[in-house]
Amino acid sequence: MPRKFLGNKIEKNVDAVRPSSLTLTADDLKYIPPIPQDFEDEDDKVLRTSNGGNRLSKRFGGTLKLKKRLESVPELFLHDFKKRPRSQLEVIREKKFTDMQVPKGPVCPQSTILPLRERKKVKSLPIQRKSLRRPTLSKPAVVQSLGHKTHSDHIIDKVFVSRPAPIVMPVKALTPINPVSLMQTQTQDCCRKNKYGKSGSEILFDEILSAYENVSTSDSTALNSEIDRIIDICASKQIAKKNEAFQVPYVVCPDDTETLFSSTTPKLKPVNSNTLNDVISSPEYTTSGCSTYSDQSNSDEELSEVESIVWNTNKRTMRSSIVSESTSEEGYCTAAETLPSTVSVEDLDIHNKLPKVAQTSSCNTLLNKLSIRKLKKVILDPPKIMHVMTFDDDSDDGDDNDDEDRALNILQKKIDCIEIASCSSSIYSE
């Protein structure tokens, strides 16, 4: 089947072929070929290889060897692992354990152990070794006598104790350390360990670190006590400043010359905070009229003599008016409302001199409302209506033409008589 990619069409008889069992018809089934008689012999030939091994047909999934390999992968791995080349050290260790195998006897009670040991003879077992570098001479076998064996029996029995002795770890006692000697030993050890030695800066750095690590406790306590003393002094100064914040000297009698001309500092007494608050003016602002005119009253010295006289005469009336206005519901007043002007419009005698406005028409009132600067005179030409002549007009009678001319003249007169009352800033005229 050819290879297909994304977007390629699949052909019916090329890419997808139906199996033969589905393509059989009734006529094909009528003519089935006969089964051969020597089928078994052919089957044996097919299932056997030239080497004598059995194999399956390719139709049934491949050879028997492939099937065995897939089913026994761990066994094949171990088989290959054993065939792998190994070093000579591994061979020596393996032979040592195989040669030194001793058969284990049955478990006997302790009473029968001693006669069995006497019967057995001590035999020397030669040890076979393979050296990698050069061969060495074989050591002579050591033969132990029976007398030596009997003497060692009671020693062996003493080894097997029912309860072993408790293990106690050694405890190191703390000893006072001299920092100078410790630094010297550390520098000597470092020089011995490092064949080439450390640089001068590294040795100095190690000495500084060791000196800071082994600081005596007496120095630290002295430093802490000094810090505490300075903190106490600072705290006491702050308390003294708070107590001496508001103090007033005692009033001394002027006749007492001793206290006036003495070199000592005068005696002080603390001041109550309530009295200070009463003396100091508050920074809050008020909306009453008195506060607004307090600044003006302070500026009387800057005014001239005439203005000061006028101001003093009107001060009472102004204060009374301010108090009355401050008690009103609004609670706010301006300078323009409170200050009385010297000349008022009502006092002027000009009402009779003002011209009286006469009643005029709507057109005149419109002209009066408009400003004179914006008025412009515009001349409009009357529209001229011309009668359009056509070919059909020649055939009409003269009476019809006269009637049309009369109607146009009447309409023209009406248009000329119309007065346009415009709201714009221009006057229309013929």
Curated annotation (Swiss-Prot):
Record bears the keyword Acetylation: no
Gene Ontology annotations for the cellular component aspect, listed alphabetically: cellular bud neck; cytoplasm; nucleus
Keyword Phosphoprotein: yes
Induction: Expressed periodically during cell division. Requires ACE2, CBK1, MOB2 and SWI5.
Main location: other
Residue numbers of Phosphoserine PTMs: S395
Lineage top rank: taxon: Eukaryota
Compartments where found: Bud neck
Keyword terms, alphabetized: Cell cycle, Phosphoprotein
Task of the protein: May be involved in the establishment of the daughter fate.
Remarks, miscellaneous: Present with 922 molecules/cell in log phase SD medium.
Protein name: Protein DSE3
Recorded name of the encoding gene: DSE3
